[in-house]
Amino acid sequence: MVKINQDLLNSIKEFTLMDDPFMTKVFEDDIERTQLILRIILENDTIKVKKASTQKRFKNLQGRDLQLDILAEKADGTKFNVEVQNESSGAIPQRARYHMSLLDAKSLPKGEYFDKIPENYVIFITKEDVLKGLLPIYHIHRTIDENGHSFADGSHIIYVNAKIHNDTPLGMLMHDFCCKNPDDMHYKKLAEKIKYFKEEKEGLDKMGDVMEKLIAKREKEALEKMAKKYEAKAAKAQKEARISLAKEMLANNESIDKIVKYSKLSVKEVRALAAKMSA
């Protein structure tokens, strides 16, 4: 476990619920607080969460696996997947569709009739207004093109715009999701848990595991970035060498086919070089 020194303590104080590692810790196995945010987002105070977990991995034997930020479930099997996204690219419609598909696949036991599949929800809380409608929340449902009627298949995709902070319950929740100081938060239950992880010794000790994973993740990302940088440089150098060879062969009046064969450039690229050299 990483020992919490002053530098790490300062980093922890900068966390908000929009930061995946911190959000994961705050909502880990926390039915009460998961239920709180679902009731606010869905404007339904009757929602009763039976199970809640974070970083739940969904295996897909024939495709890409998913690791869900928050997964909650009601007694009737209804599932809620809440994802926090700081990057707009991580909240594209196709991703929401894929999350829903796996959520549905995990909701119907073998041999059950299709009408037994429960209603399911995929909720993206996004740092930016991804759908660009200047709205605080977007509800997406399938409709019949010809008459505009609801298809009513029980799937619900919701985008919450975390940029809008106002005096509505949702606006205050988004303020709290973006707030660093628990003393400035609206919802006491969230503030208490955040204060625990940011200020109390027991909570800070538990944050050591989070920081260890975060440091490892950042080191991995740095190495991957460095590898991509050198791969790009190598590719550029290789391209330049091929162009140089092609120019030399053109100067020696070699055939286009021969130049393409040895330089690995395309016919179009070789012809463009030839035109440039003869201009």
Residue ranges, per PLM feature:
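Conserved single-residue anchors adjacent to enzymatic active/cofactor-binding motifs
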Residues: M1-G203
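Short, charged alpha-helical interaction segments and adjacent helix-coil junctions
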Residues: V2-F15, F80-Q85, G171-A279
